[in-house]
Structure formats: C-alpha cells, structure tokens
C-alpha cells in the first residue's frame, strides 16, 4: 500500500473528433433536476433541505460512467463513447446539469475521465463557478479514469486531504478529506462549535470472479486502517466518518457485512427504514452492470462516534472465513468434507498450519498476486487456533470457520460515564435515488445518463455521548 498526498497527474487529451452516426444509439436521458417529491419521512430535496437548515449537510455519490467504458453501439461492442466527442460532451453536460440542480454540499464521483483535458476543464469550470473546490485522483497505471470529490466552499472548509493508492490488481484508489462546517452549528456567548467529519470517496474492484472477494475486502480494510491511522496521528476528537462510492457489491456481500460489523450503516436504508434482512436486500437498485444484472451497489455509509465496533482484525478474520466457507460450499463440500479438505494429507484429526496454507492456496486465497500476504495468513491462523496449541481441531473449525458469521450488529459494552465525552454526529434526515424507479427495484430502459443511479443523502447534526478512550 502506498499513501500519497497531493499527487500530480499528467492528463491525456481524448479523441476530439466528431462521430459519424451509429445505429441503435440512445442519447435521450432522464436528466432530472431538483427532487420534487417527498419520501416517507416527509423531506424535500437536499438543496431545499440545506437552505432551510444551514446546519444540514448533503452528500451525493454518482458513478458517472467514463466515456472510455461506455459502449454506444450494440452491433459493435468495440465502439466506445470516448470515440465520439459530441456524445460524451453532451452526456457530461447533462450530468453536470443534474449535479448542479441538486447542489449538494459534497459530491463524490467515480469513473471520472481524468485522462481527457477537455472534460476535466469542463467540470472544473462549471463546478468551480458554482462555488466548489475540486479534488481529482487518477487510478494507478494510467487507467484513464479516477475519482472526483467536490466540496461547496460556502458550506465546508478543508482541514486536510489525503490520497490512498492500493496498487493492487484493480489499480483502485481512494480519497480522504477532513472537513469542517463553515458556519458554527452551536453558538453561545462564550464559544462556538463547527462540525468536523471525515469523508472517503472510492470505487472498489468489480467481482469478476469470486476469488476477487479477498481483494475487495482488503481494499475496504486498508481504507478503515488508514482512516484510523489518520485519526490517531492527528489526535482527532470523535467525529463522524462517511464513506461514499461505488462498492461493486450488494447488501448480501462480504464487504457490506464487514462494514456493518464495524458500526457503519447504509444511509439510504436507514432513511427508508430497511433492515439487513433478506427481504429488504433487493428493495432498491442503483446499477445495471455489463452483464445486464441490476443490483444496489452505491452506498453512502455513515459511522457515528457513539457506535460500537469490533476490533478491526477480528471483523476482518470473520469476513475472510466467510469467503473461505463460500469457496468450500461452491465446491459442494459438506462440513465434514470441508474439514477433511483443510487437513489435507495430515494423518491426525486436526488441521496444521501447513495444511491450512495449502488449502487456502487451492481456493486462491493465497499464492496469487492478489491473495493474502504472509502476515495476514498468520493473523488468520491465530484467530482460528483458539486455544493456541498449534492446530485447529474440529470444534475450532466449526466455531471459527464453518459456523462463523461476520456479525452485522455489535452490542455496546458497559461504559464508565466518567470516561464519556460529548460529540457531534449525524442523523440521517433523508436519502433518495434518481431515477425514482430504482427505489422500487426497477431499471428504467430510457435512462442513459449512466449505468448507475445518483444517490443523495441529507444529514443533520446530532449531539451524542461516546467513549473518550
């Protein structure tokens, strides 16, 4: 992992030529504008909400589908929108119209075409003129796209900005911003208080293969580790953490469950009173992928400082064991067969470190460029070997691997009131997807602004008590 602050990138100019006509190309869009409806909580659009209450903060996350990836001719899959300047220019103007009509406090965009100077300038000019400060980050290895985070300067000021480069097989990156409100949220004759919080914008690897689950989990693990390191090194007081982006995984996935075990909640689900149950897992969608499948993958995660969280390494190990179990069940192995598989050629009725390592190699969790490193393997083994006797017996296997779940709910431990302090967190006031059909689990066929929905959430400040430790 390489962490870089304020890196500079050379932007490449894309094809600026006009495009000849292509058959079966749909360019009409449900551009949308301001939200003109209420949801069940009775809230209006984010812009209206923040104007009514300046202490509110609104977030928008949107994968805007880079022109280098957008296919525009069903008869010729090799033709991309980046080949047709008039197409990508018009679509991105409509994207900007949509974003500016919403006018959120924070915009987190993914698949931003950093490799095209004209498009970059268009976003810088229009968002800059609207009062936004922009932060761009290209994916590694000159992939062409990256992230863009825009902050409204009349709402928020930047305390710090950091960049996280995973340097993995997906060339993924993340942005970390430490911001505070421009106007005090609490004020009296003696002092005033400005709200501070941390924002992450990222775009996780697409799970082209189930073996890539370990990479996606590691990306999230690195993000949380880096956020924790930043908080510790800067001796920050307890504050909310918001993770925005395209997570390329649904509510049933390992990443979702890992984040839930770390105290994060999906803002959209909270606003709509959806649970983690299977029945609520498919109530909404936000993406139609290149395979034609629709699912909900775009999230604005909220962690409040009063939330309990498991030790991160424990949650991570539970998630890896869950991935291991999935791979074993994918091979149609029963509980007994799975234990035998982990034992390998070992004659005793237990799993040794060597046989455990070999089993993980066979299911592609180690021994591949994107697999677990040596230290991670050691950490995993230490979690599984409960009694520390150097082997995993059948009971430990059942407890830690076969019957283990990445618990999505963490109970608050008893705390000492003398060790508590007051903090300012966030309350979810509203959250909306556009187009609206996606809130019903439907994908509108005439929507072509992107292959993702735009997700916007509105938060209001809330006092809460949290541990000072």
How should these model regions be labeled?
Residues 16, 24-56, 62-64, 88, ...:
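Structured beta-strand-rich core segments of catalytic domains in phosphoester-bond hydrolases
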Residues 70-75, 120-122, 145-147, 174, ...:
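Short aromatic-enriched loop/helix-cap "lid" or pocket-rim segments at secondary-structure transitions
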Residues 57-65, 90-121, 150, 177, ...:
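Active-site beta-strand/loop signature of hydrolases that rely on acidic residues for catalysis
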Residues 76-78, 123-128, 168, 217-218, ...:
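Glycine-rich, phosphate-binding/catalytic loops in enzymes
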Residues 208, 213-228:
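Active-site beta-loop-alpha substructure in enzyme catalytic cores
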Residues 2-49, 169, 181-187, 221, ...:
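Metal-dependent phosphoester-hydrolase catalytic domains
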């Amino acid at each position: 992992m390489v962490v870089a602050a304020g890196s500079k990138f050379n932007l490449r100019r894309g094809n600026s030529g006009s495009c000849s006509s292509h058959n079966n190309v749909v360019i009409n869009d449900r551009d949308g504008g301001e939200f003109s409806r209420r949801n069940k909580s009775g809230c209006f659009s984010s812009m209206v909400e923040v104007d009514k209450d300046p202490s509110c903060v609104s977030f928008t996350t949107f994968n805007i589908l880079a022109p280098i990836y957008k296919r525009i001719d069903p008869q010729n899959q090799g033709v991309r929108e980046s080949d047709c300047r008039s197409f990508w220019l018009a679509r991105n103007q409509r994207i900007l119209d949509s974003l500016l009509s919403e006018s959120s406090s924070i915009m987190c965009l993914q698949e931003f075409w950093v490799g095209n100077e004209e498009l970059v300038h268009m976003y810088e000019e229009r968002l800059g003129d609207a009062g936004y400060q922009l932060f761009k980050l290209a994916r590694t290895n000159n992939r062409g796209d990256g992230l863009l985070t825009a902050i409204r300067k009349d709402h928020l000021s930047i305390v710090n900005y950091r960049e996280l480069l995973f340097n993995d097989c997906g060339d993924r990156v993340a942005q970390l911003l430490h911001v505070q409100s421009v106007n005090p949220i609490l004020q009296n004759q003696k002092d005033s208080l400005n709200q501070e919080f941390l924002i992450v914008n990222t775009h996780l690897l697409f799970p082209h293969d189930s073996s890539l689950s370990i990479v996606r989990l590691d990306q999230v693990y690195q993000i949380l580790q880096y956020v924790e390191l930043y908080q510790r090194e800067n001796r920050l007081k307890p504050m909310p953490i918001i993770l925005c982006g395209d997570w390329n995984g649904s509510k049933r996935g390992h990443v979702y469950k890992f984040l839930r075990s770390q105290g994060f909640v999906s803002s959209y689900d909270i606003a709509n009173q959806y649970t983690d149950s299977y029945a609520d897992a498919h109530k909404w969608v936000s993406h139609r992928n290149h395979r034609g499948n629709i699912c909900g993958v775009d999230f604005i995660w909220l962690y409040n400082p009063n939330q309990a969280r498991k030790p991160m390494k424990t949650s991570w190990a539970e998630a890896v064991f869950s991935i291991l179990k999935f791979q074993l069940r994918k091979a149609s192995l029963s509980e007994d067969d799975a234990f035998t598989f982990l034992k390998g050629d070992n004659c005793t009725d237990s799993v040794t470190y060597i046989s455990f390592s070999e089993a993980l190699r066979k299911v592609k969790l180690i021994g591949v460029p994107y697999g677990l490193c040596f230290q991670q393997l050691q950490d995993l083994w230490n979690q599984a070997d409960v009694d520390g006797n150097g082997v995993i017996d059948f009971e430990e296997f059942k407890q830690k691997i076969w019957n283990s779940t990445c618990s999505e709910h963490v109970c608050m431990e008893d705390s000492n009131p003398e060790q508590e302090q007051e903090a300012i967190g966030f309350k979810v006031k509203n959250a909306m997807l556009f187009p609206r059909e996606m809130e019903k689990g439907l994908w509108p066929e005439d929507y072509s602004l992107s292959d993702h929905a735009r997700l916007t959430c509105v938060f209001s400040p809330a006092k809460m008590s949290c541990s000072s430790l």
